[in-house]
Amino acid sequence: MKVYACLCAAVVMLVMTSRVSEARSTGAPLSACRDMMPQHNATAQTSPPPYTITTDAQSVAPGDSVEVVIAGKLPEDTLRGYLLQARQGDDILGTFSLEDGDVFSQLINCGKPGNAVTHKKHDNKEDKRQVRVRWSPPQGLTGEVVFRATIVKTLKVFWVGVQSAPIKIVS
């Protein structure tokens, strides 16, 4: 009877643990699309982020794309997770695409398919030093956009609203 009770307790613990593990690191929830706040039960950092968001061009035309890179400033500044969008004011614009074989990132729908990109579930040993994606503006867009991100270093250490320099949309 004691063996049965121990076995039941072990199964209950396994189920509870797997649910907790399953709820983490699967990418940004859709509820984060507008305010970009992860559901980590922690407050965003107010210190300058140890990450940069850069592009391979200062302008892009509809029909073309630009590479966007999120990178740590130092080797120890790895990314455990992120949510990246192109914004003009509060509008989330354009479409992202991933490099072939990218096992870290996934496209999500923040109002339109592929207009945001986030991380996939992964082991902490697979945190990244940098992430590379491509972004294409929609037809008819003019003005400038910035790339805005939430970047997660650990579950409780993350920055919201990290921004790139603006890029110009040209026709």
Swiss-Prot record:
Name of the protein described by the UniProt record: Putative defense protein
Family the UniProt entry places it in: Belongs to the insect defense protein family.
Keyword Nucleus in record: no
CDD domains given in the database record: Reeler
Cross-referenced PANTHER family: CELL WALL INTEGRITY AND STRESS RESPONSE COMPONENT 4-LIKE-RELATED (PTHR45828:SF9), CYTOCHROME B561/FERRIC REDUCTASE TRANSMEMBRANE (PTHR45828)
Gene Ontology terms: cellular component: extracellular region; membrane
Glycosylation sites: 41
Keywords carried by this UniProt record: Antibiotic, Antimicrobial, Disulfide bond, Glycoprotein, Immunity, Innate immunity, Secreted, Signal
Source organism per UniProt: Bombyx mori (Silk moth)
Record-linked PROSITE patterns: REELIN
Any GO BP: defense response to bacterium
Domain Reelin, first and last residues per copy: 24-171
Annotated function: May have antimicrobial activity.
Primary location: secreted
Gene3D superfamilies, per the entry: Reeler domain (2.60.40.4060)
Signal peptide start and end residues: 1-23
Localization per record: Secreted
Record-annotated disulphide pairs: 33-110
Pfam families: Reeler (PF02014)
